[in-house]
């Protein structure tokens, strides 16, 4: 979230791991939240 991170690529060697961690958790979370929310409307 710091501006100009592309200016210092050496300062972010863990960018790939961070990206995988964020998306690996965010994608299933959004999916389950959407599924649960849709189920609430489908049941009633």
From Swiss-Prot:
It is a single-pass membrane protein. Its cofactor is heme b. It is found in: Plastid, Chloroplast thylakoid membrane. The chain crosses the membrane at residues 19-35. Its main location: plastid. With its partner (PsbE) binds heme. PSII binds additional chlorophylls, carotenoids and specific lipids. One of its GO terms (molecular function) is electron transfer activity. Heterodimer of an alpha subunit and a beta subunit. PSII is composed of 1 copy each of membrane proteins PsbA, PsbB, PsbC, PsbD, PsbE, PsbF, PsbH, PsbI, PsbJ, PsbK, PsbL, PsbM, PsbT, PsbX, PsbY, PsbZ, Psb30/Ycf12, at least 3 peripheral proteins of the oxygen-evolving complex and a large number of cofactors. It forms dimeric complexes. This is Cytochrome b559 subunit beta. It comes from Porphyra purpurea (Red seaweed). The gene is psbF.
């Amino acid at each position: 979230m710091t501006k100009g991170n592309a200016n210092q690529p050496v300062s972010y060697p863990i960018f790939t791991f961070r990206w995988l961690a964020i998306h690996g958790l965010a994608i299933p979370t959004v999916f389950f939240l959407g599924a649960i929310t849709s189920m609430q409307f489908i049941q009633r």
